[in-house]
Amino acid sequence: MAEAKYEPRLKKEYVERIRKAMQEKFSYANEMMIPKLDKIVINMGVGEATADSKKPTVAAADLAAIAGQKPVITRARNSIAGFKVRENMPIGAKVTLRGARMYEFLDRLVNIALPRVRDFRGLNPKSFDGRGNFAMGIKEHIVFPEINYDKVDQMWGMDIIVCTTATTDDEARTLLKEFSFPFRQ
């Protein structure tokens, strides 16, 4: 007997509701033209890595808990004397989410993490890059439920980039609004 395959809630919502809403609004000639989420890239830069080389490893462990996937340690491409950074020195961590993990992270981000951000007034609707990708920053990684507040010795910021197959910012903005992204008015 075949077991039912797990499908994330937001992916199911995209297939059943969001695709139809996008088709009605933009009237695409082909259903393959309807924009969809491509990937989510989470980057955590660790500026204190110059003083303590263990910091990027700690940040990577927190990022792994948040994303549910092992991150890659990013290294400096060239030396910068002013920042005391040497070439190939670990300076952060990043992870690329696709598929089910991407939809699960998006669900937690929109419904749990963003409402917990202090003084949150909504996402900047101008943070699109002109090609349908949205970038945002979070100053404290403790807004995610996977991070235990009592065990955190230092708070890290992170960049979150949501890449879509949309060709214009308007299409991407509509897609993310359908995924209930809280944009500022």
UniProtKB/Swiss-Prot annotation:
One biological-process term from Gene Ontology?
translation
What the entry lists under SUPFAM superfamilies is as follows: RL5-like
A GO CC term assigned to this protein in UniProt:
ribosome
Q: Which UniProt keywords apply?
A: Ribonucleoprotein, Ribosomal protein, RNA-binding, rRNA-binding, tRNA-binding
Family matches, as HAMAP family: Ribosomal_uL5_B
NCBIfam families, per the entry = PRK00010.1
Assembly mode: Part of the 50S ribosomal subunit; part of the 5S rRNA/L5/L18/L25 subcomplex. Contacts the 5S rRNA and the P site tRNA. Forms a bridge to the 30S subunit in the 70S ribosome.
Name used for this protein in its record: Large ribosomal subunit protein uL5
| Species of provenance | Rhizobium etli (strain ATCC 51251 / DSM 11541 / JCM 21823 / NBRC 15573 / CFN 42)
